[in-house]
Curated annotation (Swiss-Prot):
Signal peptide span: 1-22
UniProt protein name: Dermaseptin-DA2
Function: Possesses a potent antimicrobial activity against Gram-positive and Gram-negative bacteria. Probably acts by disturbing membrane functions with its amphipathic structure.
Domain of life: Eukaryota
The keyword Signal is annotated on this UniProt entry: yes
Tissue note: Expressed by the skin glands.
Organism: Agalychnis dacnicolor (Giant Mexican leaf frog)
InterPro entries from the UniProt entry: Dermaseptin_dom (IPR022731), Frog_antimicrobial_propeptide (IPR004275), FSAP (IPR016322)
Length: 75
């Protein structure tokens, strides 16, 4: 009976150790994923800002070109 208790205790102990190692690993992976998500959000925000500025400049250039063409046709 004592042998069974010791064996059961050993199995439970090893299971808990294994579980805690897995939990630490999972936490590390979650932290890495969170860092990757934050970096991708920052990149996305930079691209969004850049595209807005490029769109604004391109829109102004097209508007000026159309205005110039309209003015030339009126003369």
């Amino acid at each position: 009976m004592a042998l069974v208790k010791k064996s059961l205790f050993l199995v439970l102990f090893l299971g808990l150790v294994s579980l805690s190692i897995c939990e630490e690993k999972r936490e590390n992976e979650d932290e890495e994923e969170q860092e990757d998500d934050e970096q991708s959000e920052e990149k996305r925000a930079l691209w969004k800002t850049l595209l807005k500025k490029v769109g604004k400049v391109a829109g102004k250039a097209v508007l000026n070109a159309v205005t110039n063409m309209a003015n030339q046709n009126e003369q």
